[in-house]
């Protein structure tokens, strides 16, 4: 079997086991945390809290999470390395850039169409993270991440999507995305990726579980991509029963082999008051799928075989397909 890089080093893809394909550990605005550190508080306590929560997840039967925290979401790999070293859970880390609008100012002058023009420096950065490691940690990214939300394909967002597509073709690392499903943004992403020559079967279109539009989901699948049914617990966007129903319905339509399950949860998110989350979204945590979602899916006719496909087989297949291409 092929190998996949994790925060503790490479593993055989056969050892991924039960995998949640769209999670986070810490999400923060790094400059805010550095200059106004009160909300973050004690580093050791935050790390210990994450170790405990991920340990609970491992004990519940999950073997691997994919941490899709990239530039723009506060990625800091030395912190993730500390967490990974103290838990048996595999953590696959990501590269890419998260924005709904413009690129960070660092990229303003350099790159295609910018004042100083030149090649896309983002692509080279992403490739370095995958092939050589992130900063001086020696930890290599295993997946690429980008986002398209309500503003749509702004110039900055389109630039990131194309850079991610180019890095994917050079490395073979799969792509996973954030989308605004209600506005069918996954189709925009597929169009840009296709223009860049991406094999869309190597792409997970994220947050598809926010939608109950079967036509939209069928269109994404027809183009080849996987559906990320990956926001279980974010009931303020789509309620629990709707999320369960759409997964069950797509399974009925024969698409268990094109879906992955996850929560998009984290141990810390500085954009939301910590006391608010348990009140507004009490199910938004790492254990929700195993505690609540799986039993509900079974009640709706989803079989153990289909659950194994979505939680084990599909993640393995996504990461097994390796190598760059033209």
UniProtKB/Swiss-Prot annotation:
Entry superkingdom: Bacteria
SUPFAM superfamilies assigned: Metallo-dependent hydrolases (SSF51556)
InterPro entries, A to Z: AryldialkylPase_Zn-BS, Metal_Hydrolase, Phosphotriesterase
Molecular function GO labels: hydrolase activity, acting on ester bonds; zinc ion binding
GO biological process: catabolic process
Keyword Zinc applies: yes
Annotated cofactor note: Binds 2 Zn(2+) ions per subunit.
Known cofactor(s): Zn(2+)
Positions bound to Zn(2+) 2: 145, 178, 207
Residue numbers bearing the N6-carboxylysine modification: 145
Sequence positions that bind Zn(2+) 1: 22, 24, 145, 264
Keywords assigned by UniProt, alphabetized: Hydrolase, Metal-binding, Zinc
Pfam name, any one: PTE
Similarity comment text for this entry: Belongs to the metallo-dependent hydrolases superfamily. Phosphotriesterase family.
Miscellaneous remark of the record: Was identified as a high-confidence drug target.
Name under which the protein is recorded: Phosphotriesterase homology protein
Species this protein is from: Mycobacterium tuberculosis (strain ATCC 25618 / H37Rv)
